[in-house]
Amino acid sequence: MFDRSAAYYDRVNTVICLGMDVRWRRWAARRALASAPARRPTARGRDTSLGLRVLDAFGGTGLVALELARRGARVTLADISPGMMRIARRRAERRGLSLDIVAADLTAHAAAELPGAPFDAITVSFGLRYVDDPAGLLRGLGAALAPQGEIVVLEAVVPCGGVVAALAGAYFFEVAPRVGALLAGRGELYAQLTSTVRALGGAGDVLAHVRAAGLLPQEQRLFAGGVVAGVVARRPSGMVSSPAST
């Protein structure tokens, strides 16, 4: 399904997100690099992301991965859609950026076995809702982190509480899928979007999956009236690494 929609997927999403998705992804990239354990000061006393190893899990067309690479990180993008990864590769080439793009089903294979592991940081943007066992996925990603490394999760969620959340939810679940289906001609894609978000639940449910994975929540952010949640979690010092990451 994602292969068939790869050519227009990002454009349609930006329209139905009213352009706000750019800011969300920039936040994820910036936050992933902000406190990576390998980050070092420059001669002028400013932090640098140069050389930090980052995994962009479920990286798709590379929007977050390219933000990370633009900031100097060494990025591994992992996804299962050849069409999406093809676009990511083309974008990287056009911008003169380097991405290590790997075809990998992270629900079936250990992230710690990917090239570049262990990683200083990992991003998971709008992919958690598509897996049957979110906590299990996050646990596997946590094992691929360097000690004290962090995972940044960005995900669409069911908003809760207040008038703003109700309006945002009405737009996201009723208006946006219709607009997306009209623009893309693929109603089933946007029907799946809303159904998977409802199945995942709210921001509190994402946080619960993070805790169930044995990770330590550090920060939670809500965007767009609570329709999008950002969660930052750290690998605890006692978490067991996969043999491939030791």
Residue ranges, per PLM feature:
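Conserved alpha-helix/loop element of class I SAM-dependent methyltransferases that forms part
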Residues: 8, 17-50
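Core SAM-dependent methyltransferase catalytic element
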Residues: 213-216, 221-246
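Class I SAM-dependent methyltransferase SAM/SAH-binding core
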Residues: 53-110
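A short SAM/SAH-binding and catalytic strip from SAM-dependent methyltransferases
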Residues: 120-134
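N-terminal, positively charged/glycine-rich alpha-helical extensions of SAM-dependent methyltransferases
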Residues: 1-8, 172
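C-terminal alpha-helical "lid/dimerization" subdomain adjacent to the S-adenosyl-L-methionine
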Residues: 154, 158-213, 219-221
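A short glycine-rich, Lys/Arg-flanked "PGG" loop and its adjoining helix->strand segment in the class I
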Residues: 135-150
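A short acidic, Gly/Pro-enriched loop at the edge of an enzyme's catalytic core
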Residues: 107-122
